[in-house]
Each structure stands twice: as structure tokens, then as C-alpha cells.
């Protein structure tokens, strides 16, 4: 039992539209809609200028691949599958979207699970920018995604089994340490 509060207010008391404006999410399964890349990035920020959209994409490390597309930001993508974009490119567009939204709270749920190592590195750099100076919840199985976190909660069977920084958890020699060294070898 308990409650989740934002600035001391129980979220059950906050209107749903206000919550949506204050929480940005990048999920494992990225959703894009039919339209241009520009429109997909600007979703949720109807008054976004081209400069704001490009700046968000640059912060998300997406501008490079977008600029190389024949129509750049005006490239039309056809569906949730992203119309020919790789999983990593779709994730970078989703990250660009939440960069533009600039919400005080971020939820990143397995956002690197479907990408290759090189794309993961690019997404990691984007996450560093995205999570700077804001409350962020990062749900991850890839420990590289969370190593720089201020606090890591290790879950086991629905309960918090361990908590601490990366270094503290390695020193404890528990579940996190076992996972880390098994992935490292």
C-alpha cells in the first residue's frame, strides 16, 4: 500500500491530462504514426518550431540519420512499424519526441532491448541528455543502461531485493553483482 506523489500531491488527485504533460515515456515497443518524421517528433507539442524539432533530434542523436534521408524531416513514415526505419531509428525518433516535450519526469522502459550495440551506445548518449536534471525511472535488463544511475533498485519476484549505486551493488556481491559479472564474461 502507498501512494505516488508529484511535488507532494497524490497522482490520483492530478487530472490525467496534467499527468501526461508532466511524464515522458520511451517504451520498448516504439509507436509512430502515419505522417512525417517532423510530425512524429512534434507530437504532443503542437506549437513546436522547426528549430525546436531539430534541436530535440540533435540532443537525441537522431539528426544524423534523419538528415541523410532523401526528404529529411519531411520523410513520410507509414505506420507504427516506422515504414522502413530500423528499431533503433524508431527509438531515436521517440527519444526526440520526449526531448521536445521536456517533461520533469521520464520513464524509460526497456528502451534499448531491441537494438544492436552501436545503436544502444547512441541511445545511451541520448539518455544521458534526456535524464539530466529530472526524475527518471529506467526499467532495464541491460545493466549498461543503468550503471550511471543515482539509485538502482534490484527487483526479484516483485520485491526490492537490493538497492544502491552501481559501485555499491557490486561491492555487496549480491544479485546485481552476479548479473553484472555474468554479462561481463
Region locations from a protein language model:
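ABC-type ATPase nucleotide-binding domains, specifically the catalytic core motifs of the NBD
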Residues: 42-50
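C-terminal boundary and immediately downstream tail of ABC-type ATPase nucleotide-binding domains
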Residues: 171-185
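Conserved H-loop
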Residues: 63-70, 176
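ABC-family ATPase nucleotide-binding domain "signature/switch" substructure
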Residues: 11, 20-29, 37-40, 54-60, ...
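The conserved phosphate-sensing helix
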Residues: 34
